[in-house]
Structure formats: structure tokens, C-alpha cells
Amino acid sequence: MADKNDLSFTGLTDEQAQELHAVYMSGLSAFIAVAVLAHLAVMIWRPWF
């Protein structure tokens, strides 16, 4: 178990925070990829400019 001194205000150790950040960033990247593909599909189907 981590010492109280090793924890940040979130209660996570540095290793746990880095792992959570990596998972969050991969989910964000997937969301952005889907959003870009959806925008391209709509732009091909019905251009808005």
C-alpha cells in the first residue's frame, strides 16, 4: 500500500495516475477519430458550404 506522503490530492499514486491518463487519452483519441469520420461522412453526403 502506498504511503500517505506518496498520494496526491486525488488519492492516486503516480503510477496509477499515469495509467489512468493513458486510458483516458486512448479513449479521447478514439472519440476524436469517430467524430472526424462522422464529419467527413456528412460533408461528403451533404456539404455545408
Curated annotation (Swiss-Prot):
Coiled-coil features, chain-numbered ranges: none
Example of a GO biological process term: photosynthesis, light reaction
Signal among keywords: no
Membrane topology, as annotated: Single-pass type II membrane protein
GO CC aspect terms: plasma membrane; plasma membrane light-harvesting complex
Compartments where found: Cell inner membrane
A molecular function (GO) term: bacteriochlorophyll binding
Keyword Magnesium: yes
Topological domain ranges for the Periplasmic compartment: 46-49
Record-listed a bacteriochlorophyll binding positions: H21, H39
Cytoplasmic side: 2-22
InterPro entries xrefs: Antenna_a/b (IPR000066), Antenna_beta_CS (IPR023623), Antenna_beta_dom_sf (IPR023624), LHB-1/5 (IPR002362), Light-harvesting_complex (IPR035889)
UniProt-listed Pfam families: LHC
Transmembrane parts of this sequence: 23-45
This protein's UniProt keywords: Antenna complex, Bacteriochlorophyll, Cell inner membrane, Cell membrane, Chlorophyll, Chromophore, Light-harvesting polypeptide, Magnesium, Membrane, Metal-binding, Transmembrane, Transmembrane helix
Role of this protein: Antenna complexes are light-harvesting systems, which transfer the excitation energy to the reaction centers.
Subunit structure: The core complex is formed by different alpha and beta chains, binding bacteriochlorophyll molecules, and arranged most probably in tetrameric structures disposed around the reaction center. The non-pigmented gamma chains may constitute additional components.
Family membership noted in the UniProt record: Belongs to the antenna complex beta subunit family.
NCBIfam families: pufB_517_ASD
Name this polypeptide is given: Light-harvesting protein B-870 beta chain
Organism per entry: Rhodobacter capsulatus
Gene: pufB
